């Protein structure tokens, strides 16, 4: 009898130990935008399974949830979004799922309010914080903590991945500053389709002017086109930039208006603003997006693109492998 009881207890202990040591399934993460989803993948590694809602060319200001998106949210363990009304039309859906499961607005959780750019519109805050790499890197420790709370067995992995990735972001931040500094001072003006580069301009010392407002929901009128054409002509701006998520017609309208005033200006290239590029392309990661943007800006405005720092050599090698 005693032997039977001993065997039973031993079996229960072994089963309990096996359950405790059994690996947890990957944390199912849904991120609204690529600039969050990519960082979630870098921090989470094999301990997370990330789905990004809005792909290349997606406009978070105008995006509305489909029935498929609602199913994706329902299947998630946790939901990550930018906050500050970037995904304005998803607000009701995010609020509803926030009552059901961990839902994190990464920007308000990670970035001090005094670091924000305030604007005089119904949003009150410029939500494009990822344009300042040093500022956006603050979401990394937030994600480390958030993921560790839900998968404590992977906490060490999250910490190591987060620290390594943040070193890359620090190197990228310095490289962008050095790159922009090579542009002649009188040409250091960035004209874009909409006003998404305010944090970029503040962080890297380049004047930024958007044809459209902070949100693509705002309309561009004839007065806006004329005002911008006057600025471009008076400042002798060498190039304007289109954006991957916005129809280029407003930029082309400004170019036409500038030419009517007897001046010439061209398109300096396409920039990634509210979405990253296709996977496997130069802008298909967060680091790649900012690297591609900076390379195009510097080249078009008369600067010289410096070599990448050693801390980004691993990223550059992985990009070449993906091509």
Regions found by a protein language model. Name each.
Residues 20-323:
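Extracytoplasmic metal-acquisition and chelation regions
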């Amino acid at each position: 009898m005693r032997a039977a009881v001993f065997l039973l207890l031993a079996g229960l202990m072994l089963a309990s130990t096996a359950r405790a040591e059994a690996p947890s399934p990957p944390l199912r993460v849904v991120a609204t935008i690529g600039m969050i989803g990519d960082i979630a993948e870098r921090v989470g590694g094999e301990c997370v399974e990330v789905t990004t809602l809005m792909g290349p060319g997606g406009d978070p200001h105008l995006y509305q949830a489909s029935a498929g998106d609602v199913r994706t949210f329902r299947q998630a363990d946790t939901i990550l979004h930018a906050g500050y009304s970037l995904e304005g039309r998803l607000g009701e859906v995010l609020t509803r799922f926030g009552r059901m499961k961990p839902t994190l607005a990464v920007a308000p959780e990670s970035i001090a309010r005094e670091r924000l750019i305030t604007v005089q519109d119904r949003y009150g805050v410029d939500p494009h914080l990822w344009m300042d790499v040093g500022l956006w890197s603050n979401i990394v420790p937030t994600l480390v903590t958030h993921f560790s709370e839900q998968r404590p067995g992977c906490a060490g992995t999250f910490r190591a991945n987060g620290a390594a990735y943040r070193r890359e972001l620090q190197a990228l931040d310095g490289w962008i500053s050095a790159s922009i500094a090579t542009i002649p001072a009188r040409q250091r003006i960035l004209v874009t389709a909409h006003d998404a580069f305010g944090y970029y301009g503040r962080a890297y010392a380049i004047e930024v002017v958007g044809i459209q407002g902070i949100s693509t929901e705002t309309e561009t009128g004839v007065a806006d086109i004329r005002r911008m054409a006057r600025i471009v002509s008076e400042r002798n701006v060498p190039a304007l930039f289109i954006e991957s998520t916005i129809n280029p017609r407003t930029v082309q309208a400004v170019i036409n208006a500038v030419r009517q005033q007897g001046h010439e200006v061209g398109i300096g290239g396409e920039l990634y603003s509210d979405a990253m590029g296709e996977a496997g392309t130069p802008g298909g990661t967060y680091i790649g997006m900012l690297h591609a943007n900076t390379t195009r800006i510097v080249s078009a405005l008369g600067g010289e693109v410096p070599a990448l720092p050693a801390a980004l050599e691993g990223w550059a090698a992985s990009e070449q492998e993906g091509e």
